[in-house]
């Protein structure tokens, strides 16, 4: 076994039905697109699917350092094929340009416009958790996916120390009452102390780099719906009795 995705509808019905029984109605496919059987099963069960271009890196604009025309043309063509092949499925609701991308917001917007002109039936986003500590939206975004809206305005419950501060799952008593309303639209904006900066190490493409980030920057006030990114990244103690 290689860990490949199932390609028969019944297996996807089984997997997605389990998720639906937990109250899950949305699947994001990290840097990949599932097979036709997955969309067919999701059509039946009412699961909102988000396939994604197979890219985790930097999208530079023409003329910028790191611009790779062949790479970008390949990715754009691959996205065209995904839309043409699977786009008629009603479960194909959302589409992302990749995972934790860096580079040119303007170039990301151009690519989104290309896809929207080709197939306007779907909701599109520049990527999932792009620009990490420097969240932004481009005009072409239909929704935003990320883990934070500023250094302190966190959109999920747990973080590694490299992405500190930690989240409410790690710092507060267990609760089912936590809300993100005040994070998305803060009642009072944070201070403007732009000179109050610190150096942090961030993931950049497939490597790391050190950048200066404001400790008190107000961050992003989203104008479109918000989806939290990779919320399950924390350890739990399994109940082995569930195996049976």
Where are the model-predicted features located?
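Catalytic domains of carbohydrate-active enzymes, especially glycoside hydrolases
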Residues: 11-30, 34-35
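N-terminal carbohydrate-binding accessory modules
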Residues: 1-19, 40
């Amino acid at each position: 076994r290689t860990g490949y995705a199932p390609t028969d509808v019944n297996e996807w019905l089984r997997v997605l039905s389990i998720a639906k029984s937990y109250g899950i109605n949305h699947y994001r496919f990290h840097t990949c697109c599932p097979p036709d059987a997955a969309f067919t099963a999701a059509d039946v069960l009412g699961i909102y699917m988000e396939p994604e271009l197979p890219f985790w890196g930097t999208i530079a604009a023409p003329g910028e350092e790191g611009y790779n025309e062949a790479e970008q043309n390949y990715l754009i063509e691959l996205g065209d094929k995904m839309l043409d092949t699977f786009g008629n499925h009603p479960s194909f609701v959302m589409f992302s340009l990749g995972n934790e991308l860096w580079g040119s917001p303007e170039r990301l917007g151009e690519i989104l416009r290309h896809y929207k002109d080709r197939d306007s039936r779907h909701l599109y986003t520049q990527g999932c958790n792009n620009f990490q500590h420097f969240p932004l939206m481009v005009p072409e975004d239909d929704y935003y996916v990320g883990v934070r809206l500023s250094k302190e305005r966190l959109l999920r419950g747990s973080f590694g120390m490299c992405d500190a501060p930690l989240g409410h799952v790690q710092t507060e008593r267990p609760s089912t009452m936590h809300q993100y309303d005040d994070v998305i639209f803060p009642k009072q904006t944070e201070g403007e102390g732009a000179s109050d900066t610190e150096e942090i190490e961030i993931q950049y493409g497939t490597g790391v780099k050190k950048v200066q980030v404001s400790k008190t920057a107000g961050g992003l006030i989203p104008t479109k719906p918000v989806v939290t990114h990779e919320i399950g990244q924390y350890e739990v103690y399994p109940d082995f009795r569930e195996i049976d």
